[in-house]
Curated annotation (Swiss-Prot):
Annotated compartments: Cytoplasm; Cell membrane
Keywords on record: Apoptosis, Cell membrane, Cytoplasm, Membrane, Protein transport, Transport
Protein name as annotated: AKT-interacting protein
Polar residues bias locations: 1-13
Main location per the UniProt record: cytoplasm
Gene3D superfamilies: Ubiquitin Conjugating Enzyme (3.10.110.10)
UniProt region (Disordered), positions on chain: 1-45, 262-297
PANTHER family: UBIQUITIN-CONJUGATING ENZYME E2
Boundaries of every UBC core domain copy: 79-227
InterPro entries cross-referenced by the UniProt entry: Ub_conjugating_enzyme, UBQ-conjugat_E2_core, UBQ-conjugating_enzyme/RWD
GO CC, one annotated term: plasma membrane
Pfam families in the record: UQ_con (PF00179)
Function: May function to promote vesicle trafficking and/or fusion. May also regulate apoptosis.
Length: 297
């Protein structure tokens, strides 16, 4: 039986001899020649179970740990990165109106965003925010949304600026809930006011009992947020969202291209073919207008 060196100590060094037992001269000579061993008294090592593995150092819990979703811990960082990449792809595909979001350069668990409110009580409001994603996503709690400047709103904490997201996502369910839904909820709260269990009781009371004063407070809040729109980002991150004043030398040309952009003729013909209208003459919507006989050279 091969044993780990940790277990290779002989169990006979402490064996109790009979009173009349004497060692031979040869054994005494061997003992003098060999280095002295530490005395273990009369104690013996416990017997080794048949299938036991030697323990040479404390076992690391992370070595055998598994994530809640069954993924081995060693794959955790890669699984998290893939999940966040998939979530950001979903955000792009949803084309959320009035919302722009950008992951942080330093951490994929932090996203910078801005919401543009185009009508309603918060019209013309431009609210910058940060999304904080749990490090065990998607098996943890709901991502948090914190506004850079606290907005006067029943569901926004007047001190920290955090939006009450958990009322909409009481329990985060992986593969069912997505970050784009959190972003959409952050936009919806400015169009549909909910005063139940508010984080800002003052805003809730004014909305229910004195809507005119509530509107006045909202206007002041919007002006405050917009007045800090061109401030430098609070975080030192190259991907943090920042605004700059209109610069005609830079922005006029980009604006002109946006308004005068036209599809190229080849793109137009390609679109007709892809749509299955091969029997329609390019530039026409009349059925069967395409000439079946190609021109002869």
């Amino acid at each position: 039986m091969n044993l780990n060196p940790f277990w290779s100590m002989s169990t006979n060094t402490g064996r109790k001899r009979s009173d009349g037992e004497e060692q031979s001269g040869e054994q005494q000579q061997q003992q003098r020649a060999s280095p002295a061993r530490p005395s273990f008294g009369k104690k013996q090592l416990p017997s080794i179970p048949k299938n036991a593995l030697p323990i040479t150092k404390p076992a690391s819990p992370a070595a055998t740990a598994q994530l809640a979703n069954g993924t081995h811990a060693s794959y955790g960082p890669f699984y998290l990165e893939y999940s966040l990449l998939a979530e950001f792809t979903l955000v792009i595909k949803q084309k959320l109106p009035g919302i722009y979001v950008q992951p942080s350069y330093k951490s994929a668990l932090m996203w910078f965003g801005v919401i543009f409110i185009r009508h309603g009580l918060y019209q013309d409001g431009v609210f910058k925010f940060t999304v904080y994603i749990p490090d065990n996503y998607p098996d943890g709690e709901c991502p948090r949304v914190v506004f850079d400047i606290p907005v006067f709103h029943p569901l926004v904490d007047p001190v920290s600026g955090e939006l009450d997201v958990r009322r909409a996502f009481t329990k985060w369910r992986r593969n069912h809930n997505h970050i784009w839904q959190v972003l959409m909820y952050a936009r919806t709260v400015f169009y549909k006011i909910n005063t139940m269990e508010p984080l800002n009781p003052e805003a809730a009371v004014l909305y229910d009992k004195d809507v005119q004063l509530f509107k006045s407070k909202v206007v002041d809040s919007v002006k405050l947020c917009n007045s800090h729109l061109f401030d430098q980002p609070k975080m030192d991150d190259p991907y943090a969202i920042s605004f700059s004043s209109w610069n005609p030398a830079i922005h006029d040309d980009a604006k002109e291209r946006m308004f005068t952009h036209k599809r190229r003729p080849e793109d137009h013909h390609k679109g007709l073919q892809v749509s299955g209208l091969s029997w329609v003459k390019p530039g026409s919507t009349q059925p069967f207008s395409k000439d079946d006989n190609p021109p002869q050279n």
